[in-house]
Amino acid sequence: GLSLVLLFFFFFFENMNQILGGIMATQQIEDPVKRKIAEYALITVSIWIMVVGIYFFKFPNNFSFGGVTGFSSVVSRLTGMNASDFTFAVNTGLLVLGFLFLGTDVGIKTVYSSMLMSFSLSALDRFMPMAGTITDQPMLELIFAIFLPAIGSAILFNIGASSGGTDIIAMILKAHSSMNIGTALLVVDITSVVMSFFVFGPTTGLYSSLGLMAKSLVIDGVIENINLCKCFNIICDDPDPICDFIIKDLNRSATIYKAQGAFSHHSKTVIMTTMKRSQAVRLRNYIKKVEPTAFILISNSSEIIGKGFLSN
């Protein structure tokens, strides 16, 4: 079990940029059938990332970061009610809310995600049963229990899906308020973490509190990195070849306006454009080749509203 987990970590971190690039490429696929297939492939990968963190690190250590499973553990301890029955009932109700407030497409994605996660966890429990924790370092395992599910959740949120449970409430709050996803998750999960102090003791409660706060930060950080774009302000003498490259090779557009140097009083052209990180590298290299004296300002932005970007 440990060797497979380590192999997964190596593959994931080694291919992080390609994974994030694949997420962005999914949003740009024009064919609706191919885009849908790519989205469900991403959902599958995201769920598996979450399952690894939950099964190998969260469950063996009894970490509770909120969510339906956190509430289920608390309710089961307090009332004796079967935790699985409680989880199923609450998830069913939340799925109905998802269909009502978020639309059919999100609801179908969430049903698929929930079923895949349940099946994957059951399969691991049957074929790779965990006799105990992987290491004797709870803080180390807490990091992976936070990091992997948070990455999976962030990817799901970014393509308009969720793994079910309280993620649905977070998406509803995000859709109908100004809250970001991480803050919304913190709000809906904090109650069960507070209850864990009284039910499972201060040690578990403190670990769970730390995990919950870190999870919301990781989710927002991953979403921001997925959506990260580069904004260019290019001050040049000959804008035509640069604009042709932006339009024809990068399939982007740009805005051009005239300017004047404050010191030289020479006329200049300013090109303003925005694109994905992989395209930004190509544009920067091209400008250096065709006009080495051009002055280039490059800045980051993760929230862009307009055609061709996520925040339409």
Predicted regions, residues:
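Peripheral (non-transmembrane) domains and long loops of multi-pass membrane proteins
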Residues: 24-29, 226-312
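Alpha-helical interaction segments
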Residues: 1-2, 30
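Core subunits and conserved enzymes of cellular information-processing
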Residues: 24-238
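Compositionally biased, low-complexity peptide segments typical
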Residues: 16-23
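Hydrophobic alpha-helical signal peptides and transmembrane signal-/tail-anchor segments
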Residues: 2-14
